Amino acid sequence: MTIEFLRSELKRIIIALTASGFDRVNSGTVEKLDKIAAVAEMIGMKEGKRLIGNLSNTMKAIQERKSGAASGTVRLMALDFYVEKLAGDEDMEEL
C-alpha cells in the first residue's frame, strides 16, 4: 500500500463518518481503521497510526456508549487535518 492509497481510504472513511454521524458506525469501519493503522505503522507513519488509533478507539467507545460524538468529532478533525497535510506535502514534492 502506498501513502496515496492510505490517504484515499482514510478520506473515504472521514467523508462517510461526516455524512452519517457516529451513531451509525459499524464494526467494519472500525476494523478497516485498525488495518489502516497497522499499515501506517509498517511504513513508518507514527503520527498517522496514533491518530487513526485514537479515532478507532473512540469509535469503539461510542458504540459501547462510553463516549459521545463530541469526542469522536475532535479525533475525526485531527485525522482529517493530517490527511490534508499529507496531500499538501505530496503537492509540494511535485513542484
PLM features: residue spans?
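Amphipathic, coiled-coil-like alpha-helical segments
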Residues: 1-16, 42, 46, 54, ...
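Short, well-ordered alpha-helical segments
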Residues: 28-29, 43-59
